[in-house]
Amino acid sequence: KYGKRFFKMTATGLKLKESEYKLLMRVKDAFGNETLYEKPVSLDILVVKKDGKNYLLVPNIIFGAYKHALDSAGKEFRDRNMDTLSKIADIYRKYPGYGLKLEAHSLNIYTIGTKKYDDEERILLPVTERRAAAVKDALVKLGMNPAIIITEALGSKYPNAPVDDKSQWWKVRRVEFIMTENK
């Protein structure tokens, strides 16, 4: 839409500094004269479009097993979680015309369709609801308008790492950030 500042980039898995982004433009006129224009570009927001949603490219909020406190995964993740929340609040100060959807996830290691899986999901769904609420509360304390934040507890429907690899379990217990049109 005209007038909106939305940048789309493909996630590469690399952590890039702002100074590593460059605008390269080659201009060629009707007579064949050509010039190359190069300029560093400072991007303060990166959005990855996936499954029709605009995911903010920031570290996910990570939690300990069956926990919803922002510091439940240890000091390293507590500090990272707080940095991420500050970044999100800063983004929405700059772009107040957008909404924010928080998608909360959990880890279920049991096979889908089994009684163990269903029993575990009944425990995990309320945990993901509390995770989303904890993140929303923290963002509101950082000055965000609660009216633009919606939450969705997804349980273990969408793991982002193999659930059979214990070393990856921490990645699955998360809250992700989606930029939405503010209705």
Map each language-model feature to its residues.
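Periplasmic peptidoglycan-binding/tethering modules of Gram-negative envelope proteins
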Residues: 2-101, 113, 180-183
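Periplasmic OmpA-like peptidoglycan-binding domain that tethers envelope proteins to the cell wall
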Residues: 75, 105-183
